Amino acid sequence: MIKTSLKLILHIFLPVTLCIILTGSVVPAFAQTAPENLSEKVDTYINETMRRLPIPGLAVGIVKGDRVLHLQGYGIANANGDPVTPQTAFMLASLTKTFTALAVYQLAGSGKIDLEYRVQTYIPEFQLADEQAATLITVRDLLDHTSGISTIEGTQPYLQSTNTTFEEALNALAQYRIKHSPGTQFEYSNWNYVLLGEVITRASGEPYEVFMQKNIFDPLEMSRTTFADHHTIPGAATGNLIVFGVSVPYNEPYIPVTVSAGHLTSTAEDMTHYLTAFFDHGQYHEQSLLHSEGPGWYDTSWYWHAGTPDDISYGFSGGHNSINTNIQLFPLHRVGVVILMNTRLDTLIPGPSTDEIAFNIARIAIDYPYELPSNRRFYSGYALLDGFLLLMVVRAIWQAARLRNWGEYYRSETRLRRILTWFGIVFDLLVFLVVLVLPLAWSTRWHVVLHFRPDFAIPLLTIGLCLGALGLIKCTELTMNTNKHGQNIL
């Protein structure tokens, strides 16, 4: 996400778009008919994209106003070889948050939630290490990701466990000290929407899942949308992890404690129902999702600008280790796109994501120029990474094999070779140090990298630790031999 433009989006572009959507007005200059051969163009784009990149399967839905223009599945859904169809169930990952936000706005419209009230109004036991800070966080702070709870805290192991209860997670959060004052800075965190799920339960008097079914999924006729464990859904899409540039089946876990932040399952067909509500006054087939006197549904901070000043678009993506989903909205054209994909290409090497794919499909739908995703950066990036890891493995094995009687070999070498040997030792120790701090480059920790990219993290961490250990052993042996023989270290 482009954080620098977030405030501009929220305070200028988004309110303007909200007015357009809620009043139902459309700029007359924009054509209201789909381009000719839309399905053929989308099919060509998707098939070529899948040919270029290791994408096992995906589903696409395109709407214009209240009409579905294109709805199609491509490729394979799972290890059983089931084809992807518009009715294939996919984990939505963080797209779940958009539904949770809608539920909060519904309750705000009915007076059961006040966005400016403190979270402790609804969850009295909510605490942080800084008790004063905990009293300042509002429901709006959770919606807008301005609570001060960090991205890293939202990926802690206790939120990745299939057995953690909400009470256990809340007790763990009580030990956390927030990074910045509530309401002052945007930082995306799953914790915000975990808490909102509980706020919905407390304010509505119903379990979160029951409220969502009655007030969102049923009115939208989203009959295949569920919070049930995706493993229990026949024919559901299963994830595929990119391992060294190759797609490998991966069994994505179902984590009940984070259900309101990322564990809704839906289909492309159901999601087109959801998209049409964005362009029809918040209604679907005469069913109103929002109270007319309540706050708008669209003024939440997780929508981001992905267009140009004269052609605004908003989108939101979701992703687990092996799943990637996205919705794109072009309000001035009343065009919406949903992409559900059973792999994720951008977790390690910068590669095409569903953001890019959905954005280009939307441009096809409004008859704008578009680009096919490039695979050059993806495959060249993995080639470099795989080559580097292979070289480091060879170096570690070679150094370990020479470790026996290494001190004697060192003393028999020329001065130049000794200097080169020291350069090698320093290099090994630097690799070790870089590996230790590398996750900080992504503002994360090693346990998160190990969870999301074990194919990369395990060999890199192993290599780093081995080279560091070898370097320390050599330094120790050289020091001991120097003292023993009274010889200059070089």
Say what each PLM segment does.
Residues 2-14:
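Bacterial N-terminal signal peptides that target proteins for export
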Residues 12, 16-23, 480-490:
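Short, low-complexity, charge-dense intrinsically disordered segments
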Residues 26-32:
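Sec-dependent signal peptide cleavage junction
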Residues 33-58, 62-64, 252-483:
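Catalytic loop of the DD-peptidase/beta-lactamase superfamily, centered on the K-T-G motif
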Residues 43, 60, 66, 88-119, ...:
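Active-site SXXK
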Residues 78, 131-326:
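Short, surface-exposed loop or secondary-structure junction motifs
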Residues 115-130, 220:
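Short, glycine/proline-biased beta-turn/loop segments that scaffold the active-site neighborhood
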